């Protein structure tokens, strides 16, 4: 009868095996599909096109309200609505149109900051652009029961400027908002 002795790894072979497994794990983790900041839609970009409200309305965007721009310096149009892509969830947007990309950046940025983000001004008494302020609010709060969801917070976590358009895009965080701004930009310029 032949006796079989178990194979024993020598220390150098075991060290080599552990090193190779560690390197493989690092390489696989490094090539993961997680999103990075490079994948985010840029907050300010200029495709070289001056868009009109009619071009926005020609996308899957559905207008719910058209706002007066009297309190919105430099804006020629302002609209609130939603867009649904491929039968998915609808996302709310506030779109503000300016004469140029530079006007959108110079005049639109302060007002976009006022209407979006964790420091958004959501009170008519304090806001500069009062038109549609209720559309920029959302009910927040966790838990169950009627009183658990009683806070008011910003519907738009951030904004993006795409050409001459300032977009406030629905999202609970800046990354989600920018992703949804990217959906609108892609609807305007499908090759973007």
List the model feature ranges, each with a label.
Residues 32-85, 178-192:
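N-terminal "mature-domain start" segment
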Residues 1-11:
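N-terminal secretory signal peptides that target proteins for export/translocation
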Residues 27-30:
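C-terminal motif of bacterial Sec signal peptides marking the signal peptidase cleavage site
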Residues 21, 111-112, 188:
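Alpha-helix boundary/capping residues
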